[in-house]
Protein backbone atom coordinates (compact mmCIF):
# COMPACT_ATOMS: atom_id res chain seq x y z
CA UNK A 1 0.00 0.00 0.00
CA UNK A 2 1.35 3.43 -0.79
CA UNK A 3 2.04 5.48 2.36
CA UNK A 4 -0.78 7.97 2.78
CA UNK A 5 -3.38 5.88 1.00
CA UNK A 6 -6.87 6.74 2.18
CA UNK A 7 -10.47 5.94 1.39
CA UNK A 8 -11.64 6.34 -2.21
CA UNK A 9 -14.30 8.90 -1.07
CA UNK A 10 -17.27 6.88 -2.32
CA UNK A 11 -19.03 6.98 1.04
CA UNK A 12 -18.76 10.77 1.17
CA UNK A 13 -20.11 11.22 -2.36
CA UNK A 14 -22.91 8.68 -1.97
CA UNK A 15 -23.99 10.41 1.23
CA UNK A 16 -24.14 13.79 -0.51
CA UNK A 17 -20.96 15.25 0.97
CA UNK A 18 -19.28 16.09 -2.33
CA UNK A 19 -17.42 19.13 -0.93
CA UNK A 20 -16.09 17.02 1.93
CA UNK A 21 -15.02 14.39 -0.58
CA UNK A 22 -12.73 16.78 -2.48
CA UNK A 23 -9.79 16.71 -0.02
CA UNK A 24 -10.14 12.93 0.24
CA UNK A 25 -10.05 12.62 -3.56
CA UNK A 26 -7.10 15.01 -3.74
CA UNK A 27 -5.12 12.99 -1.19
CA UNK A 28 -6.02 9.66 -2.81
CA UNK A 29 -5.13 10.79 -6.33
CA UNK A 30 -1.88 12.51 -5.32
CA UNK A 31 -0.82 9.47 -3.32
CA UNK A 32 -1.30 7.16 -6.29
CA UNK A 33 0.15 9.59 -8.85
CA UNK A 34 3.47 9.69 -6.99
CA UNK A 35 3.52 5.96 -6.17
CA UNK A 36 5.69 3.67 -8.29
CA UNK A 37 3.37 0.96 -9.65
CA UNK A 38 2.04 -0.42 -12.89
CA UNK A 39 -1.39 -1.44 -11.62
CA UNK A 40 -3.33 -0.99 -8.40
CA UNK A 41 -5.66 -3.84 -7.48
CA UNK A 42 -8.61 -3.66 -5.10
CA UNK A 43 -10.96 -6.43 -3.97
CA UNK A 44 -13.85 -3.96 -3.85
CA UNK A 45 -15.73 -3.23 -7.07
CA UNK A 46 -17.34 -0.27 -5.31
CA UNK A 47 -14.02 1.43 -4.64
CA UNK A 48 -12.69 0.73 -8.13
CA UNK A 49 -15.91 2.07 -9.65
CA UNK A 50 -15.64 5.19 -7.49
CA UNK A 51 -12.23 5.98 -8.96
CA UNK A 52 -13.48 6.11 -12.52
CA UNK A 53 -17.05 7.22 -12.01
CA UNK A 54 -16.91 9.65 -9.09
CA UNK A 55 -13.44 11.03 -8.43
CA UNK A 56 -13.07 12.94 -11.73
CA UNK A 57 -16.53 14.47 -11.22
CA UNK A 58 -15.72 15.47 -7.64
CA UNK A 59 -12.52 17.15 -8.83
CA UNK A 60 -14.38 19.01 -11.59
CA UNK A 61 -17.10 20.13 -9.16
CA UNK A 62 -14.29 21.63 -7.08
CA UNK A 63 -12.94 23.45 -10.14
CA UNK A 64 -9.76 21.36 -10.39
CA UNK A 65 -9.45 20.06 -13.95
CA UNK A 66 -5.84 18.93 -13.36
CA UNK A 67 -6.97 16.76 -10.47
CA UNK A 68 -9.77 15.38 -12.63
CA UNK A 69 -7.26 14.34 -15.32
CA UNK A 70 -4.99 12.76 -12.70
CA UNK A 71 -8.00 10.92 -11.23
CA UNK A 72 -8.69 9.49 -14.68
CA UNK A 73 -5.06 8.32 -14.92
CA UNK A 74 -5.27 6.62 -11.52
CA UNK A 75 -8.58 5.01 -12.49
CA UNK A 76 -7.09 3.69 -15.74
CA UNK A 77 -4.36 1.92 -13.75
CA UNK A 78 -6.72 0.40 -11.16
CA UNK A 79 -8.40 -2.99 -11.46
CA UNK A 80 -10.83 -5.02 -9.44
CA UNK A 81 -9.22 -8.32 -8.35
CA UNK A 82 -11.10 -10.53 -10.81
CA UNK A 83 -10.03 -8.23 -13.67
CA UNK A 84 -6.39 -8.79 -12.71
CA UNK A 85 -6.83 -12.55 -12.44
CA UNK A 86 -8.74 -13.04 -15.69
CA UNK A 87 -7.79 -10.17 -17.98
CA UNK A 88 -4.13 -9.64 -17.03
CA UNK A 89 -2.94 -12.97 -15.64
CA UNK A 90 -5.16 -15.10 -17.86
CA UNK A 91 -6.53 -17.30 -15.07
CA UNK A 92 -9.32 -19.48 -16.43
CA UNK A 93 -9.10 -22.37 -13.95
CA UNK A 94 -8.59 -21.31 -10.34
CA UNK A 95 -8.25 -24.92 -9.18
CA UNK A 96 -5.57 -25.90 -11.67
CA UNK A 97 -3.72 -22.60 -12.02
CA UNK A 98 -3.92 -21.29 -8.45
CA UNK A 99 -4.41 -24.48 -6.46
CA UNK A 100 -7.74 -23.20 -5.14
CA UNK A 101 -9.73 -25.80 -3.22
CA UNK A 102 -12.92 -25.30 -1.23
CA UNK A 103 -15.01 -28.42 -0.44
CA UNK A 104 -18.19 -26.58 0.45
CA UNK A 105 -21.54 -25.58 -1.02
CA UNK A 106 -21.77 -21.88 -1.80
CA UNK A 107 -23.82 -19.40 -3.76
CA UNK A 108 -22.67 -16.12 -5.22
CA UNK A 109 -24.30 -12.70 -5.22
CA UNK A 110 -22.55 -10.26 -7.58
CA UNK A 111 -21.96 -6.77 -6.28
CA UNK A 112 -24.09 -4.04 -7.82
CA UNK A 113 -21.06 -1.88 -8.65
CA UNK A 114 -19.19 -4.78 -10.20
CA UNK A 115 -22.17 -5.77 -12.27
CA UNK A 116 -23.45 -2.34 -13.29
CA UNK A 117 -20.54 0.12 -13.22
CA UNK A 118 -17.50 -2.06 -13.90
CA UNK A 119 -19.44 -4.51 -16.06
CA UNK A 120 -17.45 -7.45 -14.73
CA UNK A 121 -19.89 -9.87 -16.29
CA UNK A 122 -19.42 -13.44 -15.11
CA UNK A 123 -15.67 -13.20 -14.31
CA UNK A 124 -16.06 -13.80 -10.58
CA UNK A 125 -18.61 -16.58 -10.88
CA UNK A 126 -16.60 -18.23 -13.67
CA UNK A 127 -13.54 -18.26 -11.40
CA UNK A 128 -15.56 -19.70 -8.51
CA UNK A 129 -16.88 -22.47 -10.76
CA UNK A 130 -13.31 -23.64 -11.36
CA UNK A 131 -12.32 -23.93 -7.69
CA UNK A 132 -11.64 -27.59 -6.95
CA UNK A 133 -14.42 -29.41 -5.07
CA UNK A 134 -16.69 -26.38 -4.77
CA UNK A 135 -20.43 -26.90 -5.14
CA UNK A 136 -21.53 -23.56 -6.60
CA UNK A 137 -25.30 -23.19 -6.59
CA UNK A 138 -27.12 -20.51 -8.57
CA UNK A 139 -28.78 -17.75 -6.59
CA UNK A 140 -32.22 -16.88 -7.96
CA UNK A 141 -32.58 -13.19 -8.78
CA UNK A 142 -28.86 -12.67 -8.17
CA UNK A 143 -28.92 -9.52 -10.28
CA UNK A 144 -31.30 -7.82 -7.82
CA UNK A 145 -30.09 -5.47 -5.12
CA UNK A 146 -29.12 -7.13 -1.84
CA UNK A 147 -30.09 -3.98 0.06
CA UNK A 148 -26.87 -3.89 2.02
CA UNK A 149 -24.26 -2.14 -0.13
CA UNK A 150 -22.49 1.03 0.94
CA UNK A 151 -24.40 3.25 3.32
CA UNK A 152 -27.80 2.09 2.04
CA UNK A 153 -28.25 -0.25 5.00
CA UNK A 154 -27.49 2.58 7.42
CA UNK A 155 -29.90 5.02 5.81
CA UNK A 156 -32.65 2.48 5.06
CA UNK A 157 -32.36 -0.23 7.71
CA UNK A 158 -35.92 -1.54 7.33
CA UNK A 159 -35.65 -1.94 3.56
CA UNK A 160 -32.18 -3.40 3.90
CA UNK A 161 -33.25 -5.92 6.53
CA UNK A 162 -36.21 -6.99 4.39
CA UNK A 163 -34.05 -7.42 1.27
CA UNK A 164 -31.35 -9.15 3.26
CA UNK A 165 -33.90 -11.55 4.70
CA UNK A 166 -35.14 -12.43 1.22
CA UNK A 167 -31.58 -13.05 0.05
CA UNK A 168 -30.76 -15.21 3.08
CA UNK A 169 -33.88 -17.30 2.50
CA UNK A 170 -32.92 -17.73 -1.15
CA UNK A 171 -29.38 -18.71 -0.21
CA UNK A 172 -30.61 -21.27 2.31
CA UNK A 173 -33.03 -22.80 -0.18
CA UNK A 174 -30.41 -23.23 -2.87
CA UNK A 175 -27.33 -24.24 -0.88
What is each PLM-predicted segment?
Residues 1-173:
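Iron-sulfur cluster-binding electron-transfer modules in prokaryotic oxidoreductases
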Amino acid sequence: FPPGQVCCSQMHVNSGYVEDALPVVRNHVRTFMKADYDLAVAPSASCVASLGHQQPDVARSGGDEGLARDAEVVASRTLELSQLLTDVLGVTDAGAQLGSWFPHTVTYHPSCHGMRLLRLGSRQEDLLRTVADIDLRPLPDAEECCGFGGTFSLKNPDVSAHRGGEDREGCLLYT
